[in-house]
């Protein structure tokens, strides 16, 4: 029974350490991204103008095929 308890404790401890490691890596990634975004915003003196507005092109009309099923073109 002591061996099962020992294995269970080791498993839970390993899972906890894995979770802690993953969460710290995610936190570091977010911190780096935020720092990069803040530095990028500091370098920009004024926002760039929005892209020009494009009008929507009309859809292309494709006539239905004149060939019948089972017959050639």
From Swiss-Prot:
Key words of the record: Apoplast, Cell membrane, Cleavage on pair of basic residues, Membrane, Secreted, Signal
GO BP term (any one): response to ethylene
Region of interest (Disordered), ranges: 44-73
Disruption phenotype: Slightly increased growth and fresh weight.
GO CC entries: apoplast; plasma membrane
Motif (SxS motif essential for MIK2 binding): 65-67
Biased composition (Polar residues): 64-73
UniProt GO MF annotations: LRR domain binding; receptor serine/threonine kinase binding
Major localization class: membrane
Family that this chain belongs to: Belongs to the serine rich endogenous peptide (SCOOP) phytocytokine family.
Function: Brassicaceae-specific phytocytokine (plant endogenous peptide released into the apoplast) perceived by MIK2 in a BAK1/SERK3 and SERK4 coreceptors-dependent manner, that modulates various physiological and antimicrobial processes including growth prevention and reactive oxygen species (ROS) response regulation. Inhibits root growth and regulates root meristems. Prevents general growth and development. Exhibits antibacterial effects against Pseudomonas syringae pv. tomato DC3000, Ralstonia solanacearum, Bacillus subtilis and Agrobacterium tumefaciens, thus being an antimicrobial peptide (AMP).
Subunit structure: Interacts with MIK2 (via extracellular leucine-rich repeat domain); this interaction triggers the formation of complex between MIK2 and the BAK1/SERK3 and SERK4 coreceptors, and subsequent BAK1 activation by phosphorylation.
Name used for this protein in its record: Serine rich endogenous peptide 14
Species in which this protein is naturally found: Arabidopsis thaliana (Mouse-ear cress)
Name of the gene this protein is made from: PROSCOOP14
């Amino acid at each position: 029974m002591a061996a099962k308890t020992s294995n269970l404790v080791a498993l839970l401890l390993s899972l906890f350490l894995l979770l802690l490691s993953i969460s710290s890596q995610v936190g570091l990634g977010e911190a780096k991204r935020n720092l990069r975004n803040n530095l990028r915003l500091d370098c920009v003196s004024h926002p760039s103008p929005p892209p020009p507005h494009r009008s929507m092109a009309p859809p292309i009309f494709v006539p239905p095929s004149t060939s019948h099923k089972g017959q050639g073109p």
